[in-house]
Structure formats: structure tokens, C-alpha cells
Amino acid sequence: MNAGSDPVVIISAARTAIGSFNGALSTVPVHNLGTTVIKEVLQRAKVAPEEVSEVIFGHVLTAGCGQNPTRQASVGAGIPYSVPAWSCQMICGSGLKAVCLAAQSIAMGDSTIVVAGGMENMSKAPHLAHLRSGVKMGEVPLADSILCDGLTDAFHNYHMGITAENVAKKWQVSREAQDKVAVVSQNRAEHAQKAGHFDKEIVPVHVSSRKGLTEVKIDEFPRHGSNLEAMSKLKPYFLTDGTGTVTPANASGMNDGAAAVVLMKKTEAESRMLKPLAQVVSWSQAGVEPSVMGVGPIPAIKQAVAKAGWSLEDVDVFEINEAFAAVSAAIAKELGLSPEKVNIDGGAIALGHPLGASGCRILVTLLHTLERVGGTRGVAALCIGGGMGIAMCVQRG
């Protein structure tokens, strides 16, 4: 996709705070998280619910969430029944793929205004058992839907953490190098939180409990005061034979949250006297060997940047999802990226990784970061379980 004479622009962008696993947002149904961000981005964009053409959300762990959770989120936000709403599933890339699909729909003339984003409540993901034909004797094992539908490679039947170990070995990323990436992520996120960098992008979620109504508006997952000495003491989690390097501290978390953006053509924004946050310049997706799925952003970023007519040096800010520190280090190494341009307010190792939401979450953070630092060009990218990568180029001004 190329911007053309009437590019697709992003008018507003917001996200919830990211909750820890079984934490502050764990009791909130996923569609309610979606509803919260949809309402917020419509209000910021000065768009009435009935003016929306379509709602597209990334969502991965749908089991037990009811029929079409995105439709539930859309209707909950006051968008009329006449407006279609649907989910897309591309594992970690779902939330960004939803934005790509929205831009595509607008560029083709099928839609005028689209709300796109992603949502996930990993805390509410159920355990599963297949009992259709009954059980004559013995126990029935329960499968964790987070693992079987979200975090286990379908081709090699091992955890995403093993794919990170494969990347660490192939790209020669040491345990110390991974821990350094993780500490930088935590320290940057701590600084960003204390400086209020996330305040503008976060919409509060009101959570009911026995104690009454609680307002959740601060990312819960970052560990302030993180340091290399403490991090180096953790044992490898996925490989315990003495060769492992990936630990809970240098990997992203399991989390809850939602994010959304409002898109329309530039001329539509002008007619409404709205100032875009950025225009969508290009996007790309790529496939890689599933055993090293974490390097998927390398070809995706190269292709998206080439489509935009940019060089990597032209990019002011990169938001690249930190599924694992090993992956982040390999991508930066392969592309020759300056650490000062990548995840400048911390990444998923510190903030968390709610699967279906992360793609749009990093885009929301990218847009607000570009605005805050006065940057012009940005790239959002994620690796994707199963061996893929997705990237989007956006430009302010």
C-alpha cells in the first residue's frame, strides 16, 4: 500500500493501562476493555458512533468470551447494530493487522471511518477439555488455552520461549546481552511512568470489586528498580540443561489490556477540521521459519520501509514488540538499529504483552511518542508465533 494523493490517516489513538496476569484488570471481560478504548478514541476524534463504517479488532484467546467479542465491544460503545464489527487473528500481530485491514478498507473505498485495535484478557483464558464423546474411565487432562492457542508453536510443538532460545543461539545473543536489554526496557518504562509519558495515551478502566469502584490507569507490570545484578540471578525457564538463556525477566509477560485507533482519509479529516496524529504510509508482512519466529520483523520492516521509499536511517522512532530480549537484540543487530531509537519508553518486557492488543498498543505508543519528541517518521513491528512478522510505517505532518 502506498499513501497516494489522499492517504489514510490516524485521528486518535488510546489504550488501557496494561494489567498483570491475575492483576488489576483480570476480572474485566475482554469486550469491556474493548468498549472502553472504542468510546475513548471516538470521543477524541469527535466522531459519533453512528458515523463509524466498521470496527476491526485483533483478539487471540476467544474461547469462552461469547459470540464475536468485537461485536460485543462495538455495541457496548454505543455503535449501532447496523455497523459491522469483527475480529482478526494473527497471534501477536493481530492488533496491528487490524489497523492494516482498516486502512485497506478505507483506501479501497469500502469504508469511510474505521475503528481498529486489539484486546486481550489473558487472565480470563479458560482451561479446556474435549468431552463430546464422553470419558469411559480415568482422568481428563485440561489444556491451558493460553499455551495451546497462544504460546505453543503448532509446527514444532514447543513453547515460544524455545523459539527465543533458537534465536539466541543462531544470532549469538548471550544471556548477559539479553538481561541488559531487559534492564534497559524496565528502566526506560520506569522513567516514562514517572515522567508521565504514558498519561496521554492511557484511558482509565473502572473495575468493580468488593471494595467498590477502582480506577486503573497505570501500567501494572513494570518492575521499578530493576538492575542487572538481580536479573542475572534468575534461572533459565525453558531450557534447564545448562544451555538456556531465556528467563522470566528477559521475556515479556502474560497480560490484559486493549488499544484502539480511528482511521479515515485525509480529505475526510480536513472536512471535519481534524488534525491527524499521523498518516499510514505503508505496511508489510513476512513469513520466516517457525522455529525462529522472533526474527519475523526483520523482513517485514525492510519491506515496509522500502514500500515507504525510506531508508532505516530516516526513521525517528521504532516500536518493536519485545516478546523476548533475545529477539529484540537479534533484530537490532541484523538491521543495525540505534538503541536510542528503539522502544525509547520501554517495551513489552517491562510493560507486558496482551497478545491480541499488543499490535495496536505499540502503534498507540509510537504515535504519542512521535508527537512528544517531535519526530516525523515511525515504524511499529511485531514478531508473530508460527513464523511471521508485521510492520507499519507512519508519518506525522
UniProtKB/Swiss-Prot annotation:
<keyword id="KW-0808">Transferase</keyword>
<dbReference type="InterPro" id="IPR020613">
    <property type="entry name" value="Thiolase_CS"/>
</dbReference>
<comment type="function">
    <text>Involved in the biosynthetic pathway of cholesterol.</text>
</comment>
<dbReference type="GO" id="GO:0071398">
    <property type="term" value="P:cellular response to fatty acid"/>
</dbReference>
<feature type="active site" description="Acyl-thioester intermediate">
    <location>
        <position position="92"/>
    </location>
</feature>
<dbReference type="GO" id="GO:0003985">
    <property type="term" value="F:acetyl-CoA C-acetyltransferase activity"/>
</dbReference>
<dbReference type="GO" id="GO:0046952">
    <property type="term" value="P:ketone body catabolic process"/>
</dbReference>
<feature type="modified residue" description="N6-acetyllysine">
    <location>
        <position position="233"/>
    </location>
</feature>
<protein>
    <recommendedName>
        <fullName>Acetyl-CoA acetyltransferase, cytosolic</fullName>
        <ecNumber>2.3.1.9</ecNumber>
    </recommendedName>
</protein>
<dbReference type="GO" id="GO:0001889">
    <property type="term" value="P:liver development"/>
</dbReference>
<dbReference type="InterPro" id="IPR016039">
    <property type="entry name" value="Thiolase-like"/>
</dbReference>
<dbReference type="GO" id="GO:0031670">
    <property type="term" value="P:cellular response to nutrient"/>
</dbReference>
<feature type="binding site">
    <location>
        <position position="252"/>
    </location>
    <ligand>
        <name>CoA</name>
    </ligand>
</feature>
<dbReference type="GO" id="GO:0005737">
    <property type="term" value="C:cytoplasm"/>
</dbReference>
<keyword id="KW-0012">Acyltransferase</keyword>
<dbReference type="Pfam" id="PF02803">
    <property type="entry name" value="Thiolase_C"/>
</dbReference>
<comment type="subunit">
    <text>Homotetramer.</text>
</comment>
<dbReference type="InterPro" id="IPR020617">
    <property type="entry name" value="Thiolase_C"/>
</dbReference>
<feature type="site" description="Increases nucleophilicity of active site Cys">
    <location>
        <position position="353"/>
    </location>
</feature>
<dbReference type="GO" id="GO:0005829">
    <property type="term" value="C:cytosol"/>
</dbReference>
<comment type="similarity">
    <text>Belongs to the thiolase-like superfamily. Thiolase family.</text>
</comment>
<dbReference type="InterPro" id="IPR020610">
    <property type="entry name" value="Thiolase_AS"/>
</dbReference>
<feature type="binding site">
    <location>
        <position position="226"/>
    </location>
    <ligand>
        <name>CoA</name>
    </ligand>
</feature>
<dbReference type="GO" id="GO:0045797">
    <property type="term" value="P:positive regulation of intestinal cholesterol absorption"/>
</dbReference>
<dbReference type="GO" id="GO:0006631">
    <property type="term" value="P:fatty acid metabolic process"/>
</dbReference>
<keyword id="KW-0007">Acetylation</keyword>
<dbReference type="Pfam" id="PF00108">
    <property type="entry name" value="Thiolase_N"/>
</dbReference>
<feature type="modified residue" description="N6-acetyllysine">
    <location>
        <position position="235"/>
    </location>
</feature>
<dbReference type="GO" id="GO:0005777">
    <property type="term" value="C:peroxisome"/>
</dbReference>
<feature type="modified residue" description="N-acetylmethionine">
    <location>
        <position position="1"/>
    </location>
</feature>
<keyword id="KW-0963">Cytoplasm</keyword>
<dbReference type="GO" id="GO:0006695">
    <property type="term" value="P:cholesterol biosynthetic process"/>
</dbReference>
<feature type="binding site">
    <location>
        <position position="223"/>
    </location>
    <ligand>
        <name>CoA</name>
    </ligand>
</feature>
<feature type="active site" description="Proton donor/acceptor">
    <location>
        <position position="383"/>
    </location>
</feature>
<dbReference type="InterPro" id="IPR020616">
    <property type="entry name" value="Thiolase_N"/>
</dbReference>
<dbReference type="InterPro" id="IPR002155">
    <property type="entry name" value="Thiolase"/>
</dbReference>
<feature type="modified residue" description="N6-acetyllysine">
    <location>
        <position position="200"/>
    </location>
</feature>
<dbReference type="GO" id="GO:0019408">
    <property type="term" value="P:dolichol biosynthetic process"/>
</dbReference>
<comment type="pathway">
    <text>Lipid metabolism; fatty acid metabolism.</text>
</comment>
